[in-house]
Amino acid sequence: MKVGRTILLTILAVSLITCKNSKEEEFKPKLVYESAILQVTQITENCFIHTSFLQTNDFGNVPCNGLIVSDSKEVIIFDTPVNDKSADELIKWIKETLHYKIKGIIPTHFHDDCLGGLKSFHANKIPSYAYLKTIELAKENNFIAPQNSFNDSLLLKVGDKTILAKSFGEGHTKDNVVGYFPSEELLFGGCLIKELDATKGYLGDANVAVWSSTVENIKKRFPNLTLVVPGHGKYGNAELLDYTIDLFKTKHFGEDKFESK
């Protein structure tokens, strides 16, 4: 009887693991929209990465990621596309193809790959939210500033679910925040988080000395992340946090990979 019970428990355990793995693997990422200036890739049932391209003199079109979180025909967006033209295109696609309501836009820091298309969102009467320091820095640099500020963190409802935007400290900039979607254990790290094998990138507004500790704070707060989306490059899992922590703890020689402001 003991042997039979052990076999039964083993079968049940294997079945549970198999079901879990199947659930994790059942959604295959797919490109759902593409034009010359904008791409949208669905990565889960509720989340999409929007990628627009920042034209530079030396590096051509630099791809820049943002995140769309959806539930019950509502969306909240982290980071605008890089300019108003690509932002117009994204807003039109969400409204006319998804038929979803855009409840808000959250730029994760003050650079143009986060709020370069903010004018378009405001023209469409979409409210914008940002960390207080982001608004201050946007105004200092004569950029269009987000409308609504938060001191440390912000919780917003999207459909029946909740998203969090929060500052964990300085890194890529003084004002960088991350976005977290608890129901899918998904983190939008923006330019604070690097894709695997990336170099340090643009450091003109960075605090390199504390970058690693800031990401360590994120890792401690969200220990069960399944997906992590960086501001540039390929998304992955929590391994991107470890890579970023290591990158800014040690010296890495060689030419830095370009990352836009």
PLM regions with names:
Residues 46, 69, 79, 94, ...:
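Divalent metal-coordination and catalytic microenvironments
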Residues 26-27, 31, 35-37, 42, 74-75, 82-83, 168-171, 175-239, ...:
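Metallo-beta-lactamase
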Residues 43-89, 177-191:
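Conserved beta-strand hairpin/beta-sheet module of binuclear metal-dependent hydrolase folds
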Residues 73-76, 85-128:
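Active-site metal-binding motif and surrounding structural segment of the metallo-beta-lactamase
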Residues 20-22:
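Bacterial signal peptide processing site
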Residues 1-8:
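Bacterial N-terminal signal peptides that target proteins for export
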